[in-house]
């Protein structure tokens, strides 16, 4: 699976002005951005991390292919907790490092590419567009994806992102 170039900016400079204005308001700004945890790490977790920090395999990102046992456990959880039999609907369990990776790879995992169109809301998560472009597909932005008439006549729509 190769990737195509993408042209959409993904930088925080687009929101810098809004951030500055919010900080000027009494009480400041509430930061709800991606990757900004606010809760402290529990002591037990800190101790477990510290005790394994020097292990030979403790550096770098983990392999995300997942073990057979892990995929089986996920499959069982969906069946037991949600009543969904993933095998019956021919679904695959694809572990990722995080949801952003899953979103960025989704168009490629769906085998979308040149000539395919992905519909998304005009105001949406930037990674929708970046992932679509990486797959080589085209983005079609609409005001409201639930307004099917706004995109139903766009040729070659293969996927729709819904916020």
Segments and roles (model prediction):
Residues 2-98:
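N-terminal small-domain helix-loop-helix segment of the aminotransferase-like
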Residues 58-163:
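Conserved core of the PLP fold type I
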């Amino acid at each position: 699976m190769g990737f195509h170039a993408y042209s959409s900016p993904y930088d925080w400079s687009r929101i810098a002005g809004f951030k500055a204005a919010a900080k000027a308001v009494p009480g400041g700004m509430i930061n709800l951005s991606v990757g900004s945890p606010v809760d402290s790490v529990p002591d037990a977790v800190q101790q477990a991390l510290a005790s394994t920090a020097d292990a030979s395999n403790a550096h770098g990102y983990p392999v995300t292919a997942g073990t057979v046992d892990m995929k089986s456990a996920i499959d069982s959880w969906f069946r037991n907790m949600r009543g969904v039999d993933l095998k019956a609907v021919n679904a695959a369990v694809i572990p990722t490092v995080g949801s952003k990776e899953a979103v960025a790879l989704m168009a490629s995992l769906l085998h979308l590419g040149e000539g395919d169109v992905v519909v998304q809301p005009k105001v949406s998560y930037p990674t929708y567009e970046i992932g679509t472009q990486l797959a080589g597909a085209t983005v079609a932005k609409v005001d409201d994806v639930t307004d099917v008439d706004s995109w139903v006549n766009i040729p070659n729509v293969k996927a729709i992102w819904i916020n």
